[in-house]
């Protein structure tokens, strides 16, 4: 059975020429939405997948704007609003050492180098120079950890465990 990964959500149309507005959940939008790539639009239940070929991609504000082959006006893409864009596992490329897919990191437990449990990574933000991992703590507010070498010491995907160095002012 094919394992599917969510790479974005279609939140609206854009203009009248069949462009859709996507909130991306992918690590590499420029690669994922490359012209000619096949993506799959899933229904709400995740039981049907409509293959679509990307004909254009551009970024606009915080959204990715896409058009698909054979869908040339707003009326044809209106039905996709609220749908998820997915890719099968075999479309996930190999990453360099020290690089991870979001789905591999989200859900990992986070501990300090002293072994103190801090919580679980629930989200990854990309505000600029480096990603920021949002850690849900058992009690209190979420913790924001920059994904930099000085802080993130070890990532063990198999055990879903991340070890960090707590810099002054981080907690």
Curated annotation (Swiss-Prot):
Main localisation: cytoplasm
InterPro entries per the UniProt record, alphabetical: PRC-brl_dom, PRC_barrel-like_sf, RimM, RimM_N, RimM_N_sf, Transl_B-barrel_sf
UniProt subcellular location: Cytoplasm
Keyword Ligase carried by entry: no
SUPFAM superfamilies: PRC-barrel domain, Translation proteins
Any Gene Ontology biological process: rRNA processing
Entry keywords, A to Z: Chaperone, Cytoplasm, Ribosome biogenesis, rRNA processing
CC annotations in GO: cytoplasm; ribosome
Domain PRC barrel, first and last residues per copy: 96-170
Pfam families: PRC, RimM
GO MF, one annotated term: ribosome binding
Family of this protein: Belongs to the RimM family.
Subunit structure: Binds ribosomal protein uS19.
Record comment regarding domains: The PRC barrel domain binds ribosomal protein uS19.
Job of this protein: An accessory protein needed during the final step in the assembly of 30S ribosomal subunit, possibly for assembly of the head region. Essential for efficient processing of 16S rRNA. May be needed both before and after RbfA during the maturation of 16S rRNA. It has affinity for free ribosomal 30S subunits but not for 70S ribosomes.
Protein name from the UniProt record: Ribosome maturation factor RimM
Lineage, broadest ranks: Bacteria, Bacillati, Bacillota, Bacilli, Bacillales
Encoding gene per record: rimM
């Amino acid at each position: 059975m094919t394992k599917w990964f969510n790479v974005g959500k279609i939140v609206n149309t854009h203009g009248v020429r069949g462009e859709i507005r996507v909130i991306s959940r992918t690590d590499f939008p420029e690669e994922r939405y490359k012209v000619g790539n096949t993506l799959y639009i899933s229904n709400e239940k995740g039981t049907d997948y409509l293959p679509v070929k990307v004909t254009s991609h551009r970024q606009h504000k915080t959204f990715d704007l896409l058009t698909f082959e054979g869908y040339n006006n707003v009326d044809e893409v209106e039905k996709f609003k609220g749908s998820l864009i997915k890719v099968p596992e075999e479309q996930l490329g190999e990453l360099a050492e020290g690089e991870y897919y979001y789905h591999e990191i989200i859900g990992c437990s986070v501990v300090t180098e002293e072994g103190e449990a801090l919580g679980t990574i629930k989200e990854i933000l990309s505000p600029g120079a480096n990603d920021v991992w949002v850690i849900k703590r058992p009690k209190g507010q979420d913790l924001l950890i920059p994904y930099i070498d000085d802080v993130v010491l070890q990532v063990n995907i198999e055990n879903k465990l991340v070890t960090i160095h707590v810099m002054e002012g981080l907690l």
